[in-house]
Amino acid sequence: GLEDCDFGWSPYDQHCYQAFNEQKTWDEAEKFCRAQENGAHLASIESNGEADFVSWLISQKDELADEDYVWIGLRAQNKEQQCSSEWSDGSSVSYENLIDLHTKKCGALEKLTGFRKWVNYYCEQMHAFVCKLLPY
């Protein structure tokens, strides 16, 4: 329930989420999430409902209005094989929502699609990001 998420975090389906308006590389963002109180991760997205929620969360945050990309926890382990991608929190990639891979290996949500579709982007680029944690 709501009472399980700390101030600043928003609940959805037994997890808590927060979009951060700090410019970080994918690795820095994942480290930042892990440093949060309960050891969060960059957000994994495992259903259409969760994708809608994360998109809504980003759009609610005025400081993110100028962001073109927002990091999520997807990272390709190997350029050629999408099937070896995984979420940074260890969730398996059973729900798929990608546009393309190329040689960009870190997952982001793209403003052009209303932060609704995943794109693979250059991991060293600096972007805002969304963390996700289990509240207990």
UniProtKB/Swiss-Prot annotation:
Expression by tissue: Expressed by the venom gland.
Assembly behavior: Dimer (non-covalently linked) of heterodimers of subunits alpha and beta (disulfide-linked).
GO CC, any one term: extracellular region
Its job: Elicits platelet aggregation by the binding to the C-type lectin domain family 1 member B (CLEC1B/CLEC2). Binding leads to tyrosine phosphorylation in the cytoplasmic tail of CLEC1B, which promotes the binding of spleen tyrosine kinase (Syk), subsequent activation of PLC-gamma-2, and platelet activation and aggregation. Binding to GPIbalpha (GP1BA) and alpha-2/beta-1 (ITGA2/ITGB1) may also induce aggregation, but this is controversial.
Designated name of the protein: Snaclec rhodocytin subunit alpha
GO molecular function: metal ion binding; toxin activity
Organism, scientific name: Calloselasma rhodostoma (Malayan pit viper)
Annotated ranges, domain C-type lectin: 12-132
SUPFAM superfamilies xref list: C-type lectin-like (SSF56436)
